[in-house]
């Protein structure tokens, strides 16, 4: 088992902070420049549409009556604490895993900030094809998805680290 190495993890916490900042800046701009539920076309398949998501990813639980705010906030906070420790325990060779976890951490904290401050998460990016529309999302959601994809990629193709930290 690896010891906590908070100093080595600082760069990954910096990545998470960058995600939070980009997420909050873009949400702030969207909230001030867009009208709620009114699409602003960018391309034939992409637009910005301000939405307030009271639920989870892809608007799950959006009409659950209010309990979901606290449940999802507690879940995000718990996962974030776990990720902070996980990142600090990773050996230096596991940089892709650390990057992936930092992206997930930044995304989780970006959405947690919204949920605690506003009671909902600001979404504004919409991809669509004809009448079919993907649920609205934001930079935090994108970071979480990219981080999850990197975790899968790393688990399948990444550098394996032996018990004592030697790369195989």
From Swiss-Prot:
Q: What class of enzyme is it?
A: hydrolase
Which chemical reaction does it catalyze?
Release of signal peptides from bacterial membrane prolipoproteins. Hydrolyzes -Xaa-Yaa-Zaa-|-(S,diacylglyceryl)Cys-, in which Xaa is hydrophobic (preferably Leu), and Yaa (Ala or Ser) and Zaa (Gly or Ala) have small, neutral side chains
Give the domain of life. Bacteria
Q: What does the entry list under GO cellular component?
A: plasma membrane
Q: Tell me, what does this protein do in biology?
A: This protein specifically catalyzes the removal of signal peptides from prolipoproteins.
Might you give the EC number(s) for this enzyme? Answer: 3.4.23.36
Protein family per UniProt = Belongs to the peptidase A8 family.
Q: Indicate where this protein resides in the cell.
A: Cell inner membrane
* Record bears the keyword Cell membrane: yes
Q: Where is the active site?
A: 123, 141
What keywords were assigned to this record?
Aspartyl protease, Cell inner membrane, Cell membrane, Hydrolase, Membrane, Protease, Transmembrane, Transmembrane helix
Q: Name the membrane topology term.
A: Multi-pass membrane protein
Record-linked PANTHER family: LIPOPROTEIN SIGNAL PEPTIDASE (PTHR33695:SF1)
Q: Which organism is it from?
A: Teredinibacter turnerae (strain ATCC 39867 / T7901)
Q: Which HAMAP family is this protein grouped with?
A: LspA
* Taxonomy of the source species: Bacteria, Pseudomonadati, Pseudomonadota, Gammaproteobacteria, Cellvibrionales
Q: Which residues cross the membrane?
A: 6-26, 70-90, 98-118, 139-159
Q: Which NCBIfam families match?
A: lspA
Q: What is this protein called?
A: Lipoprotein signal peptidase
Xref: InterPro entries = Peptidase_A8
One term of GO molecular function:
aspartic-type endopeptidase activity
PROSITE patterns (UniProt xref): SPASE_II
The pathway this protein participates in, as annotated, is:
Protein modification; lipoprotein biosynthesis (signal peptide cleavage)
Q: Name one GO biological process term.
A: proteolysis
